[in-house]
């Protein structure tokens, strides 16, 4: 049985009723009414709850008749051939080129209509990742994004659906969970893993150009970093940049900023910015503080 607060926070019929089957909806409606009807319930929110239940119940019956159904946090995409892609997500947030959706095992980036070149670049850069040998591939590929779908949508937008292990979390969410700053020992291993990623990017001849709290995911149990987002900015070192997030632009080397050429130094400076954003700087050892504020 849902709590009063859960019922009041329901936005779609599928948030309240477990099925689009009419008999199930009727049975669940009666069960809720037995618990929250103002004539028999002592809950102070009973009137408000039943008003919400009645509203969603009426909407549910209409949707069932029309063959439709609604559930919150459900992403429905349709490609240009008419094929539907449906999935539930845990978190939605905007990024500079569109909307992102995080689910248990995927992260989906939906690009606005006018950002096709960024969508194309992300797909190309991810597919073009290379490794010196099998050992390097086994070590590094588990941290790199893997494309499940790259879609041109029927509404003119573009969509990348990437694989995401279930035990990884957005780095900005981890920061929020810790109240704005992580314990020093966690910042230390995060910086170590980010530095390893920069070494790999340098080997492959690219700069990621989008390493931020919103584009990096971490697996706390395995002490690993996965740069799943931001690949739309990646570019061969020395080639013309497509752009960078505003936070990265603020700390870019002057040369890279003026020449607008991709440079691994941008990634190195981005990792230090992440370290500063995650830290209570005053609690860090002096050498670590000096490193985070040094120039690469």
Residue ranges and their predicted role:
Residues 66-88:
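Juxta-kinase regulatory segment immediately upstream of eukaryotic protein kinase catalytic domains
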Residues 144-185:
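Conserved structural core of kinase catalytic domains
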Residues 224-296:
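C-lobe/activation-segment region of protein kinase-like
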Residues 92-146:
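ATP-binding glycine-rich loop module of kinase domains
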